[in-house]
From Swiss-Prot:
Protein family according to the UniProt entry: Belongs to the universal ribosomal protein uL5 family.
Name of the protein: Large ribosomal subunit protein uL5
Subunit structure: Part of the 50S ribosomal subunit; part of the 5S rRNA/L5/L18/L25 subcomplex. Contacts the 5S rRNA and the P site tRNA. Forms a bridge to the 30S subunit in the 70S ribosome.
GO biological process terms, semicolon-separated: translation
GO molecular function terms noted in the UniProt entry: rRNA binding; structural constituent of ribosome; tRNA binding
Keywords from the named record: Ribonucleoprotein, Ribosomal protein, RNA-binding, rRNA-binding, tRNA-binding
Length: 179
């Protein structure tokens, strides 16, 4: 079992129950899924770019990504319907908690000039979005073997009803938010 899953069951549920006065443990918000999305705009001209992005995301998430395709043609971006434009992975269960552990304890401290995560990433319904500018902050990516530095979006979907509950949940998992 993942270390953070045990930590959630033992510590986080008790903290949040006291803080928000929940009547049952089932009311305590939990993380349902984490989605990693890597948009690759240059993939329409070169197929090798999308393959490299897929391999990077597979190393980061330890799960095979799905290639996302353009929904409609846009002439100004030289994109046709059905062209690959990125890749994404949805993590749930044990793999989700293992990725969250690596993200908070290893990857985020490796970000250059890091001063905390912006709080404006919450969407009003208890979900959190953050962007990462370089995939090289993850230890699974070998700096010498990458062709280009790419960013990715991380979406943390929770069962929290408000942003305050979601922020308390993620803070309990040691997310370093700005004050």
């Amino acid at each position: 079992m993942a270390r953070l899953l045990e930590y959630y069951r033992d510590t986080v549920t008790k903290e949040l129950t006291q803080k928000f006065n929940y009547k049952t443990v089932m009311e305590v918000p939990k993380i349902t899924k984490i989605t990693l999305n890597m948009g690759v705009g240059e993939a329409s001209t070169d197929k090798k770019i999308i393959e490299n992005a897929v391999s990077d995301l597979e190393k980061i998430s330890a799960q095979k990504p799905v290639v996302t395709k353009a929904r409609k043609s846009i002439a100004t971006f030289k994109v046709r319907q059905g062209y690959p434009v990125g890749c994404k992975v949805t993590l749930r269960g044990v793999k989700m908690y293992e990725f969250l552990d690596r993200l908070v304890n290893v990857a985020i401290p490796r970000i250059r000039d890091f001063r905390g995560i912006q709080v404006k990433g919450f969407d009003g319904r208890g979900n959190f979005n953050m962007g990462i500018k370089e995939q090289i902050i993850f230890p699974e990516i070998d700096y010498d073997k990458i062709d280009k530095v790419r960013g990715l979006n991380i979406t943390v979907t929770t069962t929290a009803k408000t942003d305050q509950e979601a922020r308390a949940l993620l803070s309990a998992f040691k997310f370093p938010f700005k004050n």
